[in-house]
C-alpha cells in the first residue's frame, strides 16, 4: 500500500510538472531581443493555457513587459501606436495584480506608464508621477524586491525627469541609478543603465571635494533611514561612504569628480559590451551613443 501511495505521489508530481507553464523560451527570446512580436504572440497563446491565478499572473506581467519593448521599437512619429501599446501593457499588469499580486506586475505597470509619460511629455503627465512612486514602493517594500535593476532604473529616470517642485531630485536619481547598475543581471548588458547614471553625474558636476563631503552626509542618512527600503535607497550613493570604490574603478568615490566618474562609467560599459558574446539591437544602439559621449567628454 505504501509503495502504491508513493507511486501515485510521484505520478502526481510528474503530471503537475508537465502541466505547469514553461517560460524558458519566452524569457530567453525576450532577453536576447530576438523577436518581441513572437514573444508577445507566444504569451497570448499561453494565457489560454494558464490553469491557475498564479500562472495567469506570470503570463500577464510578461505580456506587460514585452509591450514596453514593442512600443519602444516604433518610430517617434507613431505616437498613437506607442500610446496604445503602453496602455495595453499597463492593462496586462493590472490584470496580473488582480490575478495574483506580484512585484513584477507593479514594476512593469510603472515601466509602461513611464514610457507613456516620456512619449507624452513630462509636463503633460505629471499626475502619473505620484501613483508610480507608490507602486514602486510596493515593489521595494511590500515585496522587498531589492535586486531588480529595472525597478531602480525606473525610479532613477522618474526622479531625474521630474522638476524639483514636482518631486524630482537629482541626488535620489543618482542613488537609484547606482543601485540599478549594481543589480544588473549577468546575462544582459544594459548599457543604457550605465549611460543614464553617467549622464546624471555629468549634469550634476560635483567636484571631488564636494562629493567627499556630500557622500559622507548621505552615508549618515543611509544608516539612520529605517522607515522603508524606498526611502533608504534614496541615499544609496553614500551606503559605503566616500572611501567606497565602485566596480568600474579603483578610485574612491570621494577622490574623483562627477564628470571624471561619468567618463569612467562609459568606458566600463564599453568594455562590458566588448566582452559580451551576444548583442541585442538595443545593446548596439546604446554602444554607439556611449562611444559618441566618450568622444565628446574626452575633448
Predicted regions, residues:
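Amphipathic alpha-helical repeat scaffolds of TPR domains
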Residues: 20-28, 54-76, 100-120, 145-163, ...
Amino acid at each position: 500500500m505504501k509503495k502504491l501511495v508513493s507511486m501515485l505521489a510521484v505520478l502526481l508530481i510528474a503530471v503537475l510538472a508537465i502541466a505547469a507553464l514553461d517560460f524558458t523560451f519566452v524569457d530567453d527570446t525576450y532577453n536576447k531581443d530576438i523577436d518581441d512580436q513572437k514573444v508577445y504572440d507566444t504569451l497570448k497563446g499561453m494565457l489560454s493555457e494558464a490553469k491557475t491565478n498564479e500562472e495567469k499572473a506570470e503570463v500577464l506581467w510578461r505580456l506587460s513587459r514585452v509591450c514596453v519593448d514593442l512600443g519602444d521599437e516604433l518610430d517617434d512619429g507613431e505616437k498613437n501606436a506607442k500610446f496604445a501599446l503602453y496602455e495595453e501593457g499597463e492593462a496586462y499588469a493590472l490584470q496580473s495584480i488582480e490575478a495574483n499580486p506580484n512585484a513584477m506586475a507593479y514594476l512593469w505597470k510603472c515601466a509602461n506608464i513611464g514610457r507613456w509619460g516620456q512619449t507624452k511629455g513630462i509636463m503633460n503627465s505629471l499626475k502619473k508621477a505620484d501613483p508610480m512612486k507608490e507602486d514602486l514602493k510596493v515593489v521595494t517594500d511590500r515585496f522587498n524586491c531589492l535586486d531588480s535593476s529595472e525597478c531602480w532604473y525606473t525610479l532613477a529616470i522618474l526622479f531625474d525627469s521630474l522638476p524639483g517642485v514636482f518631486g524630482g531630485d537629482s541626488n535620489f536619481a543618482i542613488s537609484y541609478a547606482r543601485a540599478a547598475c549594481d543589480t544588473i543581471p549577468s546575462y544582459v548588458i544594459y548599457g543604457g543603465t550605465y549611460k543614464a547614471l553617467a549622464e546624471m553625474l555629468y549634469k550634476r558636476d560635483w567636484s571631488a571635494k564636494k562629493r567627499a563631503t556630500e557622500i559622507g552626509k548621505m552615508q549618515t542618512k543611509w544608516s539612520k533611514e529605517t522607515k522603508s527600503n524606498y526611502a533608504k535607497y534614496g541615499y544609496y550613493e553614500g551606503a559605503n561612504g566616500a572611501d567606497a570604490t565602485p566596480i568600474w574603478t579603483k578610485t574612491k568615490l570621494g577622490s574623483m569628480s562627477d564628470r571624471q566618474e561619468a567618463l569612467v562609467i562609459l568606458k566600463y560599459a564599453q568594455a562590458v559590451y566588448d566582452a559580451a558574446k551576444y548583442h541585442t539591437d538595443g545593446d548596439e544602439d546604446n554602444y554607439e551613443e556611449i562611444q559618441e559621449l566618450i568622444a565628446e567628454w574626452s575633448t
